[in-house]
Swiss-Prot record:
<keyword id="KW-0240">DNA-directed RNA polymerase</keyword>
<feature type="binding site">
    <location>
        <position position="86"/>
    </location>
    <ligand>
        <name>Zn(2+) 1</name>
    </ligand>
</feature>
<feature type="binding site">
    <location>
        <position position="462"/>
    </location>
    <ligand>
        <name>Mg(2+)</name>
    </ligand>
</feature>
<comment type="similarity">
    <text>Belongs to the RNA polymerase beta' chain family.</text>
</comment>
<comment type="subunit">
    <text>The RNAP catalytic core consists of 2 alpha, 1 beta, 1 beta' and 1 omega subunit. When a sigma factor is associated with the core the holoenzyme is formed, which can initiate transcription.</text>
</comment>
<comment type="function">
    <text>DNA-dependent RNA polymerase catalyzes the transcription of DNA into RNA using the four ribonucleoside triphosphates as substrates.</text>
</comment>
<feature type="binding site">
    <location>
        <position position="892"/>
    </location>
    <ligand>
        <name>Zn(2+) 2</name>
    </ligand>
</feature>
<keyword id="KW-0862">Zinc</keyword>
<dbReference type="Pfam" id="PF04997">
    <property type="entry name" value="RNA_pol_Rpb1_1"/>
</dbReference>
<feature type="binding site">
    <location>
        <position position="73"/>
    </location>
    <ligand>
        <name>Zn(2+) 1</name>
    </ligand>
</feature>
<dbReference type="Pfam" id="PF00623">
    <property type="entry name" value="RNA_pol_Rpb1_2"/>
</dbReference>
<dbReference type="Pfam" id="PF04998">
    <property type="entry name" value="RNA_pol_Rpb1_5"/>
</dbReference>
<feature type="binding site">
    <location>
        <position position="895"/>
    </location>
    <ligand>
        <name>Zn(2+) 2</name>
    </ligand>
</feature>
<dbReference type="Pfam" id="PF05000">
    <property type="entry name" value="RNA_pol_Rpb1_4"/>
</dbReference>
<dbReference type="GO" id="GO:0000287">
    <property type="term" value="F:magnesium ion binding"/>
</dbReference>
<dbReference type="InterPro" id="IPR007066">
    <property type="entry name" value="RNA_pol_Rpb1_3"/>
</dbReference>
<protein>
    <recommendedName>
        <fullName>DNA-directed RNA polymerase subunit beta'</fullName>
        <ecNumber>2.7.7.6</ecNumber>
    </recommendedName>
</protein>
């Protein structure tokens, strides 16, 4: 007691510690146990005295006093009466804070159904009763009666009766012989009478006996809910309420406004309606009113309670006085403004301020400039305490006055307080973790925050008016974390790709580029210098310039750490940069002895960081920055209009292209090509033209002009310097300034045929200007959409991956995934080395030539390993991956590999899921929103041939070729690949060559670099004859299956296959046959006839009775009809892949290996089946008629081959080829989108997300576990259930992984808190309550919501220590219990002391 008295002013009772949270349905007794009294009146407060009405919604007797320790009538005041209940007004004398905690209840005169269990789909009550929602609503809203007890009558149990039928039945069978009820009471009776065990047993039998496919699914759903009620201890009748809880009054306050009006929470209105209707109903029942009136009142009560719980879920939305919908209890939780997202996950922070940022070039990397005014305000409490400690002030009031007057001693103290106290700077939008970093404040005059220029790229900040917020970490722990983890000097590398993010940009790059230029014939060329002092002296004397070619001595250190000096051919400018380079054996002068573009500077910083560590790199970066700024200012680079050089050849090129387009027009008029092909070719020609103009311009700008007399090189073009160095501007922008603007897009996304020939220097014509406005406006609209979409993608990614935390060092998994270099059209897009860097080898990596082990199994692959892997010519490496990691909750460090932001193995407790989500989401705003509608030209035309990038010998895989009548080698195989090998047989490149291409090389040829391997027509796809013979037409009849179109303008005829889906006559299957001399169809060597089915739109390129050779085309399919599919690009594509949506024209993939057979057509679909070679069951596909199937009857396909082209659906890849192939597909497809924009993201981030998309397993055979066949269960639950089964020697379940989209996966996490705060709050909570779910609070989000330390980072260590401590406590208690059992209970003095 005595402690309680002392503790009044600081009642810090520790919150009860808990490890998990359970959610269930509240029973009527539970609601009554929470309540402090029943609310009988709808009144709130007395409007004269402002005191709460007794028994009303704010009643002080039920909820507690309004003022601390004072009863309502004022008889008892002050502390000494604590705990007394006043006999006059009935109010307990206690803290007014209890009005935030105490609940009341309303006793309902008639039970009502809880709307969440009724209307939240699937309706829980409906599922349990096996009734439709419509029937349920008819009973609940008093339209139909339901038979509860049929008695001896011929009515059935649970039969619905309308009013008339009910009266008729009463007349027929007598009122007492059966019971029928209406409303929630009826449903409650039925629910109460359910025997769940019997229903569950019956359902299991029914599922086992079901024959159709849909029935067991439906029954399984119902069985699941029955089992949920059995296991959770919820009773079905609790879904019908007899008492409504009333939340504490201070959570739905009534606030007096000036002018005698009140602002009130909507909940009070909703409660008032419930109470009014309930009281009216009670009165009507007492008065024995007619049935119909009571029924109406009950219905109104049901509606009032519905509105209170979830307004608008059923019927009209109930609005307040101002026509605004009232916010019900459900709305309080939902959405961005709901409790979860507004108050629990995102809170406003005190001790923070914001201001505009300006550049602070003289700051060190770890500093920021903080305005004195801001610092004084932010650090006030620290200043007060320091003033007090130093004796400047005796009270806080005095200290406040001193600070307000800004006395000199206050500034001195501010300096002390701020020393070594980091502050955090944040720039919105915070897209990744580098959006908040810690700095040491430096006090400055003025009102703007100064920011170090090198951290701008991390914040994505510029100084055109951006604002930033400052936050002060208060506790020692927070300061420690800010200094150790968040200091800008600790965040040199980008977490997404491990490259430096503290990279000079703009002026600094320009300055360093200018320094590192070397020119011919400058004064003093060829002089030798011993050290920097001599060079500076010569520069000042103007004996040499910064760009002179000189020979200078550079002093470095060798591997033993001894200094050495070496003479390099270099320039004074480069020596200046070299002077700043830290001395290290691995860092030679060659790092700086080159032209310093932005990329080279980045590589240089990377090298310094890798070899010399963090401290050296930070110092180096600061010095490089100073040097860059100084030299950019000294160089005085600017540009005028004459620097934009329009190439002389431009008009020749334009004329040439105009002639080409005229020719295409003519070809179209002659009927040689279709409208679509003409469009493709024209667009293509102009595209090439504008590229060539740009090339010419770049040539002219970059070429070095020399002074004819002295031979000295002239000043390099300034624009070229800016663009080439990477400081500002890109070739694409220069092309628009001085080349030609090129093709523009219509608002619909198609490309306009006539390009913009002018550039900005020449100026646009009116027509051109108008044409270019579409694109400009679309760009602006896109940007706005993009930001929102990108943010939403990031949110979904974070939500799906937030539980992926490093929880153990090594899971010991034997599995892994195979990595190869990614080669696209013969170009190496991502080398093998770059993909395996920083990952763990799953097997020994062996050098093929010598058999030496380069990297032993289980070792992380570092930079020096990568160099050896590159040299050794290894093609494939098996590495550990998070996809195959066997850790239960979270991921293990070995499978994850290197922490990219630190360059070291990843730490325990690192939240890799969130990092992955941020790395993928942050560049989202740079991706386009564009969906390309391309007739194939712009993407295909450049790929009408393939060249070799290497010298070597040609090997051809799957060589199936034929010589056509023109004598060319034509590719007849679908999967032919030309492999180029070295003399020693190492594969250099693999080039896939498409069907119908003409091969320019053959097996065993030697090939030079740049030599063509194959060519093909990019605009059409041929159908080739495989045998020599004579052409015959089948089912090709003029007018129905084929049209002979004569072009009006040219009079040339061509035959096009048309869709013969007419109701009349037999079904036609147009085809071309190849017959022998004997007039019979030739048999193909692989079985089947030489019959070529023709797809719609195919153009026939042969005449009947024409003689063909193998490899000749019988028809061609225009590419536009095969290719005008929208190529979804950019952000929508990434979202589509992560959401695992089926693409519109999904490819059809062979599920088994076997032989193709065509069956009877079905309506407008073609039937195709694959017969397996081993004689198993055939697999059948129905394919829409318009689709081109490039397989003939009798072709042999491998499992996983494409039958119909298109984008494959990820689910199919998973089902047919397995997890590793799926991951490879998703990683490649997503990377492709980012690569186009030049964004680098490490594969492991995408793998982390994919791992979380594969959390569920679908049960194939439940064995002897509790699962149902076809049920989706969590992977961990699946493993645990099988382990349990194995222990009990039962048959385990089998299943296969299921791919879920990120939204779906987030909603199905094991934590209902995390799911509810993401989306569809009502549905998630309803489901969790029915199942009586327990949230173990393992993820990040749940812990933020309940206000605990998150189990990642520092929190992970704390959690680990807590578990160890708990186990120790248990041990001590257990041993003590054991000892006490053997000893008589006599309390000795030692025990008492304890």
């Amino acid at each position: 007691m005595n402690q309680e008295v002392l503790n009044v002013f600081n009642p810090t009772v520790p919150a009860p510690a808990f490890n998990q949270i359970r959610i269930t349905i509240a029973s009527p007794d539970k609601i009554k146990s929470w309540s402090y009294g029943e609310i009988k009146k709808p009144e709130t407060i007395n409007y004269r005295t402002f005191k709460p009405e007794r028994d009303g919604l704010f009643c002080a007797r039920i909820f507690g006093p309004i003022k601390d320790y004072e009863c309502l009538c004022g008889k008892y005041k002050r502390m000494k009466y604590k705990g007394i209940i006043c006999e006059k007004c009935g109010v307990e004398v206690t803290l007014s804070r209890v009005r935030r905690e105490r609940m009341g209840h309303i006793e309902l005169a008639a039970p009502v159904a809880h709307i969440w269990f009724l209307k939240s789909l699937p309706s829980r009550i409906g599922l349990l009763l096996d009734m439709t929602l419509k029937d349920l609503e008819r009973i609940l809203y008093f339209e139909y009666f339901v038979v509860i007890e049929p008695g001896t009558t011929k009515l059935k149990y649970r039969q619905l009766l309308s009013e008339d039928e009910y009266l008729r039945a009463q007349d027929e069978f007598g009122e007492t012989n059966f019971t029928a009820m209406i409303g929630a009471e009826a449903i409650r009776e039925i629910l109460r009478g359910m025997d769940l065990d019997k229903i569950a047993a019956d359902l299991r039998v029914e599922i086992a006996e079901a024959t159709t496919e849909l029935k067991p699914k439906k029954l399984a759903k119902r069985l699941k809910i029955v089992e949920a009620f059995q296991q959770s201890g919820n009773k079905p009748e609790w879904m019908i309420l007899t008492h409504v809880p009333v939340i504490p009054p201070d959570l739905r306050p009534l606030v007096p406004l000036d002018g005698g009006r009140f602002a009130t929470s909507d909940l009070n209105d909703l409660y008032r309606r419930v109470i009014n209707r309930n009281n009216r109903l009670k009165r009507l029942i007492e008065l024995r009113a007619p049935d119909i009136i009571i029924r109406n009142e009950k219905r109104m009560l049901q509606e009032a309670v519905d509105a209170l719980f979830d307004n608008g879920r059923r019927g009209r939305v109930i609005t307040g006085a101002n026509k605004r919908p009232l916010k019900s209890l459900a709305d309080m939780l939902k959405g961005k403004q709901g409790r979860f997202r507004q108050n629990l996950l995102g809170k406003r922070v005190d001790y923070s301020g914001r201001s505009v940022i300006v550049v602070g070039p003289e700051l060190k990397l770890h500093q920021c400039g903080l305005p004195k005014k801001m610092a004084l305000e932010l650090f006030k409490p620290f200043i007060y305490s320091r003033l007090d400690a130093k004796g400047h002030s005796a009270t806080v009031k005095q200290a406040k006055k001193l600070v307000e007057k800004e006395r000199p001693e206050v500034w001195d103290i501010l300096d002390e307080v701020i020393r070594e106290h980091p502050v955090m700077l944040n720039r919105a939008p915070t897209l990744h973790r580098l959006g908040i970093q810690a700095f040491e404040p430096v006090l400055i005059e003025g009102k703007a925050i100064q920011l170090h220029p090198l951290v701008c790229s991390a914040f994505n900040a510029d100084f055109d008016g951006d604002q930033m917020a400052v936050h002060v970490p208060l506790s020692l722990e927070a300061q420690l974390e800010a200094r150790v983890l968040m200091m800008s000097t600790n965040n040199i590398l980008h977490p997404a790709n491990g490259q430096p993010i503290i990279v000079p940009s703009q002026d600094i790059v320009l300055g360093l580029y200018y320094l590192s230029i070397m020119k011919e014939k400058e004064p003093g060329e060829g002089m030798m210098f011993a050290n920097m002092a001599e060079i500076d002296h010569a520069l000042n004397a103007k004996a040499i310039t910064l760009a002179t070619k000189i020979r200078g001595r550079y002093n470095g250190v060798d591997a033993e750490g001894k200094p050495y000096s070496k003479i390099y051919e270099t320039s004074p400018g480069r020596m200046k940069i070299g002077e700043l380079l830290p001395k290290h054996p691995k860092l030679s002068y060659d790092v700086v002895n080159k032209l310093m573009t932005k990329k080279e500077i980045s590589n240089m910083i990377d090298a310094v960081y890798r070899h010399c560590g963090q401290k050296e790199s930070v110092i180096f970066c600061d010095r490089i920055m100073a040097l860059g700024f100084y030299n950019a200012f000294r160089a005085g680079i600017s540009f005028g209009k004459d620097d934009m050089v329009v190439p002389k050849k431009k008009w020749d090129l334009v004329e040439e292209t105009r002639a080409l387009t005229k020719e295409y027009e003519q070809q179209y008029n002659d009927g040689l090509i279709t409208q679509g092909e003409k469009y493709n070719k024209v667009v293509d020609a102009w595209g090439k033209c504008s590229d060539r103009v740009a090339e010419e311009m770049m040539k002219e700008i970059s070429s070095v002009k020399k002074d004819p007399k002295t031979g000295r090189e002239k000043q390099i073009n300034s624009i070229y310097m800016m663009s080439h160095s990477g400081a500002r501007g890109s070739p694409a922008q220069m092309k628009q300034l001085a080349g030609m603007r090129g093709l523009m897009a219509k608002p619909s996304g198609e490309i306009i045929e006539s390009p913009i020939i002018s550039n900005f220097k020449e100026g646009l014509t009116v027509m051109e200007y108008f044409n270019s406005t579409h694109g400009a406006r679309k760009g602006l609209a896109d940007t706005a959409l993009k930001t929102a979409n990108s943010g939403y993608l990031t949110r979904r990614l974070v939500d799906v991956a937030q539980d992926s935390i490093i929880t153990e060092r090594d899971c010991g998994s034997e599995k892994g995934i195979h990595m190869r270099a990614i080669i696209d059209a013969g170009q190496v897009v991502a080398s093998l080395a770059s993909r395996v860097l920083g990952r763990t080898a799953a097997e020994d990596i062996v050098e093929p030539a010598t058999g030496n082990v380069i990297v032993p199994r289980g070792t992380m692959i570092e930079e020096w390993h990568v160099e050896r892997i590159n040299k050794s010519g290894i093609q494939e490496i098996k590495i550990r991956s998070v996809l195959t990691c066997e850790t239960r909750n979270g991921v293990c460090g070995t499978c994850y590999g290197r922490d990219l932001a630190r360059g070291t193995p990843v730490n325990m407790g690192e939240a890799v899921g969130v990092i992955a989500a941020q790395s993928i989401g942050e560049p989202g705003t740079q991706l386009t929103m564009r969906t390309f509608h391309i007739g194939g030209a712009a993407t295909l035309a450049d790929s009408s041939y393939v060249e070799s990038n290497f010298e070597g010998i040609v090997r051809i895989r799957n060589r199936n070729v034929a010589r056509n009548s023109e004598g060319d080698l034509v590719v007849m195989a679908r999967n032919l690949a030309v492999v180029i090998v070295d003399v020693d047989g190492t594969e250099r490149a693999v080039n896939r060559v498409q069907y119908g291409a003409r091969l320019k090389v053959d097996e065993g040829d030697t090939i030079k670099r740049g030599q063509r391997i194959a060519e093909w027509d990019p605009y059409t796809r041929p159908i080739l004859s495989e045998v020599d013979g004579i052409v015959a037409f089948e089912d090709l009849t003029e007018g129905s299956s084929m049209n002979e179109t004569v072009d009006e303008s040219t009079g040339i005829a061509k035959r096009v296959v048309t869709d013969s889906r007419s109701g009349r006559g037999p079904e036609l299957r147009p085809a071309i046959l190849i017959k022998g001399k004997d007039g019979k169809i030739i048999k193909l060597p692989r079985g089947g006839d030489a019959r070529y089915a023709l797809p719609v739109e195919a153009i026939i390129s042969v005449d009947p009775n024409q003689t063909l050779k193998a490899g000749d085309a019988v028809a061609r399919v225009p590419m536009e009809s095969a290719k005008t599919r929208d190529i979804t690009g950019g952000l929508p594509r990434v979202a589509e892949l992560f959401e695992a949506r089926r693409p519109k024209d999904a490819a059809i993939i062979a599920e088994i290996s076997g032989t193709i057979r065509f069956g009877r057509d079905y309506k407008n679909k073609r039937r195709l089946s694959i017969e397996p070679a081993d004689g198993g069951d055939a697999v059948e596909y129905l394919i829409p008629k318009g689709k081109h199937i490039h397989l003939q009857d009798g072709d042999v396909v491998e499992k996983g081959d494409f039958i119909v082209d298109g984008n494959p659906a990820p689910h199919d890849i998973l089902a047919i080829k397995g997890v590793e192939e799926l991951a490879a597909f998703l990683v490649n497809e997503i990377q492709e989108v980012y690569r186009l924009q030049g964004v680098h993201i490490n594969d492991k981030h995408i793998e982390v997300i994919v791992r979380n998309m594969l959390q569920k397993v679908e049960i194939d055979d439940s064995g002897e576990t509790d699962f149902l066949d076809g049920e989706q269960v969590d992977r961990i639950e699946f493993i645990e259930a099988n382990e349990k089964a194995a222990e009990e020697a039962k048959k385990p379940a089998t299943g296969h992984p299921v791919l879920l989209g990120i939204t779906k996966a987030s909603l199905q996490t094991r934590s209902f808190f995390s799911a509810a705060s993401f989306q569809e709050t009502t549905r998630v909570l309803t489901e969790a309550a029915v199942n009586g779910k327990v949230d173990p609070l393992e993820g990040l989000k749940e812990n933020v919501i309940v206000g605990r330390l998150i189990p990642a980072g520092t929190g992970a260590q704390m959690a680990r220590l807590r578990t160890i401590a708990n186990s120790r406590d248990d041990l001590i208690v257990a041993t003590r219990d054991e000892q006490s059992e053997g000893q008589p209970l006599v309390q000795g003095p030692a025990d008492a002391a304890e």
